[in-house]
Amino acid sequence: MSSSDAGLEEGPELSITLTLRMLMHGKEVGSIIGKKGETVKRIREQSSARITISEGSCPERITTITGSTAAVFHAVSMIAFKLDEDLCAAPANGGSVSRPPVTLRLVIPASQCGSLIGKAGTKIKEIRETTGAQVQVAGDLLPNSTERAVTVSGVPDAIILCVRQICAVILESPPKGATIPYHPSLSLGTVLLSANQGFSVQGQYGAVTPAEVTKLQQLSGHAVPFASPSVVPGMDPSTQTSSQEFLVPNDLIGCVIGRQGSKISEIRQMSGAHIKIGNQAEGAGERHVTITGSPVSIALAQYLITACLETAKSTSGGTPGSAPADLPTPFSPPLTALPTAPPGLLGTPYAISLSNFIGLKPVPFLALPPASPGPPPGLAAYTAKMAAANGSKKAERQKFSPY
């Protein structure tokens, strides 16, 4: 048995279908594809995994591996040893300098990274110690997505064991809410998913055909009406502004702001919404957060903020998914909406995973159906109050840093 197969015999086999996405540089992609595609063809045949590589001329590409757990791990093993072979063949500068370790960058939804890190970093520390590989979870989201890069470095055998343990963790902790996947060749705009409505994706895309819309309906399991491009008939979506206001505990506001304001700037850029965090009032345990912009921008900004809070709660000792009853979930109804909010967008929302949309042809603005003349019955604006993760108030703000 070769060393590339040694790590595949450990642990019980899981009878499920696994999908693993990796971010690779152009040189790495070229090595995996090989001359006339011979290398990737051999990996597909020997591992029985389905391997796709995203198109595009950008420096980075997404490699997606799908199949049974045995097939996926076998493919990862072959990729790791191929990259190690390339590093051995590369001429060393100076002769005495040791070659760099093999590095794989996994792409994982941010809502699952909290479980991967564990309480106070205990889980990721355990993975490092038991596998011998170096693992680091990026502190920032990948551009225009709700995913993070998880970097795994070391010798091929250590990487294989590490990927096994990472996959075991993410399989036990499914992603929460909608996932906006990272794709280097796409410039995703804002996304809104709402009950009795389709989804809206704005960006630089080509034409969409009714056949493609039907395919999206089948993939998502929900109807996607092919309607007018206007959110509210006769009005430009970019001009329909409204505001939402909610409270965030002082001990969690740091994860929303980020180091030197990096996180809040990222959320503003991704959502296109204006986000204002109020000053801390004397004796108050919460901070006011006001989001202003189009309904689409507000929905995405609210989701991104909630994802930050969920990650911070998981790393601070809270149980993932055990949010207080008054914690707003992704794409929840408007919290404190101004009268200018379009009534048709105040429906009860739900989240659809966008992961299935990767690999489809470029999609333009898929319009929402015309808004109803009045708000849905029984819906009233409210202000949700978020409790601290441990139910107490802390004097100092909790800071979130990458592990």
From Swiss-Prot:
It comes from Mus musculus (Mouse). CDD domains: KH-I_PCBP4_rpt1 (cd22517), KH-I_PCBP4_rpt2 (cd22520), KH-I_PCBP4_rpt3 (cd22523). The lineage of its organism: Eukaryota, Metazoa, Chordata, Craniata, Vertebrata. PANTHER family: KH DOMAIN CONTAINING RNA BINDING PROTEIN. PROSITE patterns: KH_TYPE_1 (PS50084). It comes from the Eukaryota. Pfam families: KH_1. Keywords: Cytoplasm, DNA-binding, Repeat, Ribonucleoprotein, RNA-binding. GO terms for biological process: negative regulation of DNA damage response, signal transduction by p53 class mediator; negative regulation of mRNA splicing, via spliceosome; regulation of mRNA stability. GO terms for cellular component: cytoplasm; ribonucleoprotein complex. This is Poly(rC)-binding protein 4. Gene3D superfamilies: K Homology domain, type 1 (3.30.1370.10). Single-stranded nucleic acid binding protein that binds preferentially to oligo dC. Its main location: cytoplasm. The keyword DNA damage does not apply.
